[in-house]
Amino acid sequence: MKKYSALTLIMALALCASQFVQAQASKDAKEAAKYSKEGFEATENKDWDKAVDAFRKAAQLDRKQAPNLVAALQHRGMEYTTQKQFPEAIADFSEALKLKSDDANIYERRAYVEMKISDYDKALTDYSEAIKLKPNDVRYYLYRSYIYETKGDVKNSMADTEKALKLDPNNQEAKSRKTRLEARQSANAPLPPPPPKSSPRASPAAAGRP
């Protein structure tokens, strides 16, 4: 009889705990929805500081809100890039990558900023990550080829250039680089490479409203 009573008590406590967790989850979801609404309103006004703050609070309460935070961080990061606030831009893209590490576009955006401050080693790493995620994107090979050439690594620069031409045989930038690299190999003379013409995509995919 005592064993039966103890078992009943344990089951009752477990039920109460489950109900409490469900109630708390429901409360958190409602609170997250409120912050999310504030974030969308800030987004419409292009107030990225407020949007990031609101979506961050929402994501802390409900992980389903994380994509909205990722989008807001990218928008603010690109705004920082435009304003030449490069450390702040890198910080936002880095936070976005912690939440979505499989997004090649974010690696590209961070690498673009790293190139702006001549941090070529980090940019090289980020473009390599982008290539792993999107191995058929010609632009990534062109950028990485440019970095290799800037660092004096003609062999790897040529390898990426040839990969770009394999993906896009008519790519004029790749053709010009290959000609220049071949001349450099022949003359064994360091020639300063012109920067690539392409740039990161204009904006991240906007998160849909719930």
Give a label for each model feature.
Residues 32, 66-70, 104-105, 138-139, ...:
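Helix-start (N-cap) detector for alpha-helical repeat units in TPR-like alpha-solenoids
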Residues 57-60, 64, 95-98, 129-132, ...:
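Conserved structural position within tetratricopeptide repeats
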